[in-house]
Amino acid sequence: MQTQIARAMFQVYEPIVLAAGGSNTPENQTICKQLGLGDHRMSYYATRSAPLGRVGAEVVSAIFYHHSVEMVSPAIPLAWSIASPERIVAARFEAVDQALRRLLPQQIESAEIAEAVALVRDAMLGCPIAGRPLFAAHAALQWPSEPHVALWHGLNLLREHRGEGHTSAVMAARLPPNQAAPMLIATTGEARDSRSWRWPDERWNHAVAGLHERR
């Protein structure tokens, strides 16, 4: 039952988190361009990992698990020399504020938003940080004062907590990072180019062969 509830919640908050705070939103792209963060890859890794501080590509790759160092290293740590992690965190919240004002202009000051923030903050009490470094870093941020931005922050926390639960499950199954990526592609039916995260062909093919051996 708990799994069913978690999945039902995910289906509700995932579209909201991505529509308002995803790296592809026009607001996020504009603000990241103003900061000088360059391409989509840099803006993605910088905005999502900024709460961790000035970490290197190896740390981001390890925490994101199935994102190879080769994929992360063109963006991190270069991003921190362009804008500080603290500025990037603030910029992401600014982009979320603008996006929600565009998407929900009549609702952002409603009583329902304020009530939802209270519920999400209560939900955080049941989300342990142990073994979830990215969630812990985001959870350590100060909650935004604007209720609609605070709601997005809380929903994003739920998303990151769930995501690192997936990482724990993959590790418990003894799936190395390079096998986790093709496993995801196999289950979603997506093309490899959309989800390869720049694993070199030799390592990718070795991972696929390893998955076949596990059957």
Regions found by a protein language model. Name each.
Residues 1-214:
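Phosphate/adenylate-binding glycine loop and adjacent helical scaffold
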